[in-house]
């Protein structure tokens, strides 16, 4: 079964998230976008877990769906069987290892809410899991993996957004130089890595040590409307077992939907306070120091990949999965109309397109240009074609500042 899956998301119980992060709204936005399978997010949070138990029903195969009584009326107009949920959560581990402070985020997928109960009980002995849906714990990533395997051998641990400077397994600030250094003798139990918004598969192909891992992509959405910024293209039996096989072996993982990596917040080196954005070559020439204030630059993902790469830029992995780089539809409409994504004009056009043409992913990936033109006009049709063909100008993000993707030549 062809499925689009977004496995790393957050509920309203994580810090800096939208209050809209409820099971009903997640189901609604997933349907609207054309996503068949999403993570629950935040399984460690006790209140959220109880809400999931109340509002979701097990399908008996390791996946859940929203109980019919909770499905929003406006969700029912979208075709298909509705959204499937898989139990998921993210843990922020901050700890000392090999003489350095490490800050690593890991995503865990589990086949049941019962397994989540046991995992949460174990984690609660280590630290506070009540105040943040993504708990911050003084727990070595190796020990987290060991705990998960003990509690639930069928669990899946995926290092999250692996290149982010501050909170990832390979990050420049507080990560490691290899997955093996982080997870030691348990590294063979890691089968997939999340590339994050600021990198794409091609960047990861440059590091031969990563060849054995499946590369997955997820939105890390902090509000339901951000679901699917990145996602996985699957052709699987729609069950936890099918998902497990895809992530652990690649069977049924057909590819990913990506941000243009330059749009991510940490693609280039830079210093946001001074408005300084630099390529790896420029940053090296300056010794990693901000030319305005003299402070240390935040090293971006592009530079960090360059540090660890043993293959030239442009290398194509023979068995690498396909990937598509897209721009969210509201951003396309915004660029074409000249209004902000939150404006009534842009939101009105977005709703009209969804109502007439289908889901957001269908519009961005499949709907013929002529149909888009008939519904939304020539400029929006052209903008979507430019995205599909990669004919865009990329202004890289840096030091927490999102990059910009220009769909039209502004000259």
Predicted regions and their residues:
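An N-terminally biased module of ancient metal coordination in phosphate/nucleic-acid-related enzymes
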Residues: 1-93, 98-101, 391-393, 402-410
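Extended substrate/RNA-proximal surfaces in nucleic-acid metabolism proteins
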Residues: 2, 50-191
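Divalent metal-coordination and catalytic microenvironments
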Residues: 8, 42, 85, 108, ...
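Histidine-centered divalent metal-coordination motifs
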Residues: 8-12, 161, 222
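Histidine/acidic-residue-rich catalytic or RNA/ligand-binding cores of hydrolases
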Residues: 15-18, 49-53, 167-174, 205, ...
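Short acidic/histidine-rich active-site segments
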Residues: 212-228
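Cys/His-rich short segments
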Residues: 254-324
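Low-complexity, acidic/Ser/Thr- and charged residue-rich accessory regions of DNA metabolism proteins
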Residues: 333, 338-411
